[in-house]
Design a protein with these regions (language model features):
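Beta-strand initiation motifs
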Residues: 136-139, 193-198
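Beta-propeller blade signature
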Residues: 125-133, 183-191
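Short aromatic loop motif centered on NTY/YTY
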Residues: 148, 152-162, 171-175, 195-231
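Bacterial Sec-dependent N-terminal signal peptides
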Residues: 1-42
């Protein structure tokens, strides 16, 4: 979900009219996975372009930045629903485009994440969750609480208990140049849908679906690993 304030929600309602018209053309013209990758890269390039212009206080550039984020989100969702390859293709062209793809080992669950470039030192991220049930692919963008900047997922780990398979998503949030946050979020696929709140982590207060902590980035900046993983 892109928008975390009421004003931004109004932007999405307006631009979704445009995206709806775009969606009609997507239903008509099939594309290869390579063509889809090229198209997604073009939108990411435009996001960078309008983010740069918006820093120069060009109001119209910020509107265009919001629009590009919405279109990218909606295109991803539509392409995933139509093309099962979206859960396994490597998307090597997008690796250096502020775009992250985390995939479960069984390739039945994938999270696409990108920096919307709408913030300053605090980064706001969008995600699209994609999963497969009986060879049918599903996708949606999760809803975030108002004011939550979201984060990107670098990894998905797969575990199995005596009953079922479940997944651990490794999320990173950039709250400022110094302050960052990491968490593990537990997912499972049940009753034909993705459960974002699968409570498998035992804490002193009971079972929870997420476990995370804040830290000072400058205290670990010397680590060579990127992204830094502290769990």
């Amino acid at each position: 979900m892109i928008f975390t304030t009421p004003i931004m929600t109004l932007y999405k309602s307006f631009y979704l009219l445009i995206v709806f018209l775009l969606g009609i053309s997507l239903n008509i013209y099939a594309q290869s996975i390579q063509q889809i990758e090229t198209e997604l890269k073009q939108h990411l390039t435009r996001i960078d372009h309008f983010a740069y212009l918006s820093l120069k206080t060009e109001a119209s550039a910020f509107d265009s930045l919001l629009s590009e984020n919405i279109i990218l989100e909606e295109k991803l969702i539509q392409y995933i629903k139509k093309n099962p390859e979206m859960l396994s293709y490597e998307f090597s062209q997008l690796k250096n485009e502020n775009f992250s793809v985390a995939t479960s080992p069984d390739r039945k669950f994938r999270i696409f994440s990108w920096d919307q470039r709408t913030g300053g030192s605090m980064h706001f991220y969008d995600n699209v969750f994609a999963y497969q049930i009986n060879k049918e692919t599903f996708a949606y963008s999760p809803t975030l609480p108002e004011g939550n900047p979201g984060g990107y997922y670098s990894d998905i780990y797969q575990l199995k208990d005596e009953k079922e398979t479940f997944y651990l998503g490794y999320q990173h949030r950039v709250l400022s140049n110094r302050d960052q946050f990491q968490c593990i979020q537990v997912f499972n696929i049940e009753k034909g849908t993705l459960n974002e709140q699968y409570k498998k982590i035992l804490t002193k207060s009971g079972y929870t679906a997420t476990l995370g902590f804040s830290f000072n980035f400058f205290s670990v900046v010397d680590k060579k690993e990127r992204p830094i993983r502290l769990f």
